[in-house]
Amino acid sequence: MADRRLAARMQRVEIEDTSVTAPLSRHPDDEPPADLPTGHHPLLRWWPLAAVVVLCLVAATMLASARDRAFVARIEAVPGLVRPLDAAPTPLWEVGGRTANGAVLAADSALVVLGESDDEWRVTAHDPATGAVLWAVPVGPASRSGFESSGVTCPAQSGAVGSLVLCLVPQPRVLYSDEASIQEQPRLTVVPLSARDGTRTGSWDVRGDVVGIERIDDDLVIGQLTPDGHLKVQRRSGRSGAVVWSYVTPVAMAQLLTASMRVLPPIVVLDGESTIILDAADGRTLVAGARFSGLQAAPLRGRFATWAPVGGAHMHDVDGTELYRMPGLPAQLAADDGSEPARVIVDEGSQLVSLDLGTGTEQWRTASPLDPRVLVGHRLVVSGAGTYGVLDASDGRELWSVDTDDALGWEPLSDGTLVLGPGLSPDGRPELWARALADGVRYWAVPLPEHVRHVDAVGGHLVVRTPNDLIVYG
């Protein structure tokens, strides 16, 4: 019985060894599958999907690159901001000798520097990346013994002048001369230069004592006192001197107090025994303060605000119409990228207040002894004494702050993602610190020259000044 069961289970089986009959030149595993056409590889089924993935990656890369370029262009176009930095900056080039304070301008694609030698005042255009001289033009003689001082200036709003450089060259009068020479009217020559090649495009004079002279667009606004103490203000073409508009104050401005004039686009503020605010575009009177009222004014995005000891602060529309009361004047920021267009920041000294631009409604209030400096990317950079930091502009929360253990020699800047502020090395030497705008994490520290006086953003470029040198970093 057992033998039959065993015999039933044990059957003869023949095994065909295909490897014996297969050609020696081909491995059995190399045979194409029976159910696929010859020449059709399985991976080919997936090539359309792979192509789509590659296209998506390329598109994403191109989109990110476009966003980066757009971000760089947007930040670079904001006066007072530094062009976004890819790494810690290093000195690119420098100009030694006597350069007028503030006399570096962004003109077209060049950096223009006003400097004084022993013989002359000279305007020189440099390539921002290399410092190579593009052109140089003498504009006036240096100060000489026996003559009045001849300090040349080239005014600008926010350091950018576009295609036209305007320089103001005093014509010094002889000192210790005869009475006729002493009584000669002061004369100031306006020298317009093409930013492209330095070509002098004209010349015209301003005669008489000047209370103030400032640039707006390609024009100059000039304030002068009349013999009876009234203030005469003219807006004149920077190229030709042609008068755009003219205004004379109805009351004397300088009988008991010194008169002054400031251009704060879109307004011109005349100060003295009374305060008068003009429209910078056409010279219309927008506000006329009472005599000795102590009226102050500050511009804000096409509008302006006023403050007086009696009556407090008010926001005004562009035509001078009073809109609403305010707790104080709006903070004057060194840079504003427009990321909070409907917000007004007011500095009350011990507190910062955010108001709705349209209605004046208070949005938030936070205790802070620091002053607002820069508004960028919905963040408010603040500083004061030896401290600087960042607030969230949407709610006033402090995001971070740092104490440098020393008085700030210059105010912090930003490149849109970093705060570039002053600091000290462990051995007490000046440094430029870069901290993340969002959280204050320190990325790098760059040594600065001893006796650094200013660190500024000019046309997006980082400019460091000492008493004797002007150094461009990048």
List where the protein language model places each region:
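Secretory-pathway ectodomains
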Residues: 2-474
